[in-house]
Amino acid sequence: METVVAFTAIAVSIMIGLAALGTALGFGILGGKFLEAAARQPELAPQLQVKMFIVAGLIDAIAMIGVAVALLFTFANPFLTQVAG
């Protein structure tokens, strides 16, 4: 039983870490491409900014879903009931 809890803690750490890493990379790429496009066509910057914020929200939502699944495994571990019988 302790092994399941330990492996769950490791899995939760990996899930949250990869979600944070993916979000950071996504925001970095998104910001870089936005600045590149705004420098190329400054008159489109307001329209691009709105679209950038929409995509930023979607990128952040994926990380939040990963954190929610990690919290599910932390506090309501479905694997413990299978081991306990």
Curated annotation (Swiss-Prot):
The chain crosses the membrane at residues 10-30, 53-73. It is found in: Cell inner membrane. Signal peptide: none annotated. The record marks 60 as: Reversibly protonated during proton transport. GO terms for molecular function: lipid binding; proton-transporting ATP synthase activity, rotational mechanism. The gene is atpE. F-type ATPases have 2 components, F(1) - the catalytic core - and F(0) - the membrane proton channel. F(1) has five subunits: alpha(3), beta(3), gamma(1), delta(1), epsilon(1). F(0) has three main subunits: a(1), b(2) and c(10-14). The alpha and beta chains form an alternating ring which encloses part of the gamma chain. F(1) is attached to F(0) by a central stalk formed by the gamma and epsilon chains, while a peripheral stalk is formed by the delta and b chains. InterPro entries: ATP_synth_csu_bac/chlpt, ATP_synth_F0_csu, ATP_synth_F0_csu_DDCD_BS, ATP_synth_F0_csu_sf, ATPase_proteolipid_c-like_dom, F/V-ATP_Csub_sf. Keywords: ATP synthesis, Cell inner membrane, Cell membrane, CF(0), Hydrogen ion transport, Ion transport, Lipid-binding, Membrane, Transmembrane, Transmembrane helix, Transport. Belongs to the ATPase C chain family. This is ATP synthase subunit c. It holds the Pfam family ATP-synt_C. F(1)F(0) ATP synthase produces ATP from ADP in the presence of a proton or sodium gradient. F-type ATPases consist of two structural domains, F(1) containing the extramembraneous catalytic core and F(0) containing the membrane proton channel, linked together by a central stalk and a peripheral stalk. During catalysis, ATP synthesis in the catalytic domain of F(1) is coupled via a rotary mechanism of the central stalk subunits to proton translocation. Gene3D superfamilies: F1F0 ATP synthase subunit C (1.20.20.10). It comes from Idiomarina loihiensis (strain ATCC BAA-735 / DSM 15497 / L2-TR). It is a multi-pass membrane protein. One of its GO terms (cellular component) is proton-transporting two-sector ATPase complex, proton-transporting domain.
